[in-house]
Amino acid sequence: MDPNTVSSFQVDCFLWHVRKQVADQELGDAPFLDRLRRDQKSLRGRGSTLGLNIETATCVGKQIVERILKEESDEALKMTMASAPASRYLTDMTIEEMSRDWFMLMPKQKVAGPLCIRMDQAIMDKNIILKANFSVIFDRLETLILLRAFTEEGAIVGEISPLPSLPGHTNEDVKNAIGVLIGGLEWNDNTVRVSKTLQRFAWRSSNENGRPPLTPKQKRKMARTIRSEVRRNKMAD
């Protein structure tokens, strides 16, 4: 096993422990608490994959961080923080929308790289909007926290979430997963829109209505439908 993978996990465990202490003292805002919950699931998955105990890893991570802080001067810390790019946390969904449980009548699940896509195939002829909470850096999506598909009535009918056992994903991973989710929902004649925030940072190839261009498969399906309609009209004449 790569020692850097182990030490990274150990440090992440300790830093999560520190953030948990901040949350317990009611010093964290909603995005902070949101990331805390998500990262806890991720650490559990990584610990299971690596075969490492989280409590033991936390103790070792503390020793690593303490050694680094002891060796680093205040001036070096200031320079590091000044040169580090700052990310922004953007929210389409409320805490209630993110934490709400939902169920599927006809569940379908697909894993696309480090992301899990879930949708309810029983949903038909609905207007659906995709919303997401994520961080942005350099005007591009950095980390997806959670994406969900909502009907006009507010029901959740689809979701994209990072796999705890496979931390880390790219902007392209998210974009591909969004395409899969949209394609699955549109297959049942649903109309899907993407939130303005997602359009700007994660789904740039969309038109002015916030809908992505048709895929080649969708274009072929539409062409067959049009040809069929034309034939019927000719026969009626």
From Swiss-Prot:
<feature type="short sequence motif" description="Nuclear export signal">
    <location>
        <begin position="137"/>
        <end position="146"/>
    </location>
</feature>
<feature type="region of interest" description="PABPN1-binding">
    <location>
        <begin position="223"/>
        <end position="230"/>
    </location>
</feature>
<dbReference type="GO" id="GO:0039524">
    <property type="term" value="P:symbiont-mediated suppression of host mRNA processing"/>
</dbReference>
<feature type="region of interest" description="Disordered">
    <location>
        <begin position="205"/>
        <end position="237"/>
    </location>
</feature>
<keyword id="KW-1262">Eukaryotic host gene expression shutoff by virus</keyword>
<dbReference type="GO" id="GO:0039540">
    <property type="term" value="P:symbiont-mediated suppression of host cytoplasmic pattern recognition receptor signaling pathway via inhibition of RIG-I activity"/>
</dbReference>
<keyword id="KW-0945">Host-virus interaction</keyword>
<protein>
    <recommendedName>
        <fullName>Non-structural protein 1</fullName>
    </recommendedName>
</protein>
<dbReference type="GO" id="GO:0042025">
    <property type="term" value="C:host cell nucleus"/>
</dbReference>
<keyword id="KW-0832">Ubl conjugation</keyword>
<keyword id="KW-1103">Inhibition of host pre-mRNA processing by virus</keyword>
<keyword id="KW-1048">Host nucleus</keyword>
<dbReference type="GO" id="GO:0003723">
    <property type="term" value="F:RNA binding"/>
</dbReference>
<keyword id="KW-1088">Inhibition of host RIG-I by virus</keyword>
<keyword id="KW-0694">RNA-binding</keyword>
<feature type="compositionally biased region" description="Basic and acidic residues">
    <location>
        <begin position="226"/>
        <end position="237"/>
    </location>
</feature>
<keyword id="KW-0899">Viral immunoevasion</keyword>
<comment type="subunit">
    <text>Homodimer. Interacts with host TRIM25 (via coiled coil); this interaction specifically inhibits TRIM25 multimerization and TRIM25-mediated RIGI CARD ubiquitination. Interacts with human EIF2AK2/PKR, CPSF4, IVNS1ABP and PABPN1.</text>
</comment>
<dbReference type="InterPro" id="IPR009068">
    <property type="entry name" value="uS15_NS1_RNA-bd_sf"/>
</dbReference>
<dbReference type="GO" id="GO:0030291">
    <property type="term" value="F:protein serine/threonine kinase inhibitor activity"/>
</dbReference>
<dbReference type="GO" id="GO:0039657">
    <property type="term" value="P:symbiont-mediated suppression of host gene expression"/>
</dbReference>
<dbReference type="InterPro" id="IPR000256">
    <property type="entry name" value="NS1A"/>
</dbReference>
<dbReference type="GO" id="GO:0039502">
    <property type="term" value="P:symbiont-mediated suppression of host type I interferon-mediated signaling pathway"/>
</dbReference>
<dbReference type="InterPro" id="IPR004208">
    <property type="entry name" value="NS1"/>
</dbReference>
<comment type="function">
    <text>Inhibits post-transcriptional processing of cellular pre-mRNA, by binding and inhibiting two cellular proteins that are required for the 3'-end processing of cellular pre-mRNAs: the 30 kDa cleavage and polyadenylation specificity factor/CPSF4 and the poly(A)-binding protein 2/PABPN1. In turn, unprocessed 3' end pre-mRNAs accumulate in the host nucleus and are no longer exported to the cytoplasm. Cellular protein synthesis is thereby shut off very early after virus infection.</text>
</comment>
<keyword id="KW-1192">Host mRNA suppression by virus</keyword>
<feature type="region of interest" description="RNA-binding and homodimerization">
    <location>
        <begin position="1"/>
        <end position="73"/>
    </location>
</feature>
<keyword id="KW-1102">Inhibition of host PKR by virus</keyword>
<dbReference type="GO" id="GO:0039580">
    <property type="term" value="P:symbiont-mediated suppression of host PKR/eIFalpha signaling"/>
</dbReference>
<feature type="region of interest" description="CPSF4-binding">
    <location>
        <begin position="180"/>
        <end position="215"/>
    </location>
</feature>
<feature type="short sequence motif" description="Nuclear localization signal">
    <location>
        <begin position="34"/>
        <end position="38"/>
    </location>
</feature>
<keyword id="KW-1035">Host cytoplasm</keyword>
<comment type="similarity">
    <text>Belongs to the influenza A viruses NS1 family.</text>
</comment>
<keyword id="KW-1190">Host gene expression shutoff by virus</keyword>
<dbReference type="Pfam" id="PF00600">
    <property type="entry name" value="Flu_NS1"/>
</dbReference>
<keyword id="KW-1090">Inhibition of host innate immune response by virus</keyword>
<dbReference type="GO" id="GO:0030430">
    <property type="term" value="C:host cell cytoplasm"/>
</dbReference>
<keyword id="KW-0922">Interferon antiviral system evasion</keyword>
<dbReference type="InterPro" id="IPR038064">
    <property type="entry name" value="NS1A_effect_dom-like_sf"/>
</dbReference>
<keyword id="KW-1114">Inhibition of host interferon signaling pathway by virus</keyword>
<keyword id="KW-1113">Inhibition of host RLR pathway by virus</keyword>
